[in-house]
Swiss-Prot record:
Gene for this chain: aroD
Pathway(s) of this molecule: Metabolic intermediate biosynthesis; chorismate biosynthesis; chorismate from D-erythrose 4-phosphate and phosphoenolpyruvate: step 3/7
Active site: H143, K170
Positions of 3-dehydroquinate binding: S21, E46, W47, R48, R82, R213, S232, Q236
Subunit-structure text: Homodimer.
Enzyme Commission number(s) from the entry: 4.2.1.10
NCBIfam families the record matches: aroD
PANTHER family: 3-DEHYDROQUINATE DEHYDRATASE (PTHR43699:SF1)
Top-rank taxon: Bacteria
Catalytic EC class: lyase
SUPFAM superfamilies hit by this protein: Aldolase (SSF51569)
HAMAP family given in the database record: AroD (MF_00214)
Descriptive protein name: 3-dehydroquinate dehydratase
Reaction(s) catalysed by this chain's protein: 3-dehydroquinate = 3-dehydroshikimate + H2O
Length: 252
């Protein structure tokens, strides 16, 4: 299986990498939170742009991205607009969503973009090609904050992302039972052993799914999300606790 290298970080080998999400409403908060995050122990900084109020002003968005880049130049920067339908803060048109991601790619400030699988097949394929032409990696994602489908459907979605040339397929699902967590873990293992030729990221959310955020190295998930301050999704634990557990499992 091939790995994905972003800056000096190799994703897909060793212990799962820790991603943290920065969610700030304006440039002043972006700056203050970036300074606070700089001291934390994590591997990838995700900027959740859907929390940014001045979204219609591309110059303002990119000015904020520049602050993040300059504050943490060594950290890979993942640019993510999470749509309202997949648990995000704002709803925008597909056209605006694609344009925003293209602007991020053009800026030269971001290392990766998050691209939602169900944006539309043609738009997804075109945006992946555009990102790769500009040396930007793509985390292709799907989130369901209500339920967990059968393992076969989870695998089908991850394989579709891979077929669309995502650098890293990602899926996050809400369990209604412990059995749903097992379905997610079983799907992750089957995908990793039988179909994946690149790193994948999977997680089961909420308290019920916390084990999936810790056991990625066992079942085949290459990264996990932790919290520096406020969690960006239910079930996230602090980066310090997360690093401790990931290290214990890696060294066992």
């Amino acid at each position: 299986m091939k790995t994905v290298t972003v800056k000096d970080l190799v994703i897909g080998t060793g212990a799962p990498k820790i991603i943290v999400s920065l969610m700030a409403k304006d440039i002043a908060r972006v700056k203050s939170e970036a300074l606070a995050y700089r001291e934390a122990d994590f591997d990838i900084l995700e900027w959740r742009v859907d929390h940014f109020a001045d979204l219609s002003n591309v110059e303002s968005v990119m000015a904020a991205a520049k602050i993040l880049r300059e504050t943490m130049p060594e950290k890979p920067l993942l640019f993510t607009f999470r749509s309202a339908k997949e648990g995000g803060e704002q709803a925008i048109s597909t056209e605006a969503y694609i344009a925003l991601n293209r602007a991020a790619i053009d800026s030269g400030l971001v290392d990766m973009i998050d691209l939602e699988l169900f944006t539309g097949d043609d738009q997804v394929k075109e945006t992946v090609a555009y990102a790769h032409a500009h040396d930007v990696k793509v985390v292709m994602s799907n989130h369901d904050f209500h339920k967990t489908p059968e393992a076969e459907e989870i695998i089908a979605r991850l394989r579709k992302m891979q077929s669309f040339d995502a650098d890293i397929p990602k899926i996050a699902l809400m369990p209604q039972s412990t059995s749903d967590v097992l379905a997610l873990l079983a799907a992750t293992l089957e995908m990793q052993e039988q179909y994946a030729d690149r790193p994948i990221i999977t997680m089961s959310m909420a308290k019920t799914g916390v084990i999936s955020r810790l056991a990625g190295e066992v079942f085949g998930s290459a990264a996990t999300f932790g919290a520096v301050k406020k969690a960006s999704a239910p079930g996230q634990i602090s980066v310090n606790d997360l690093r401790t557990v990931l290290t214990i499992l890696h060294q066992a």
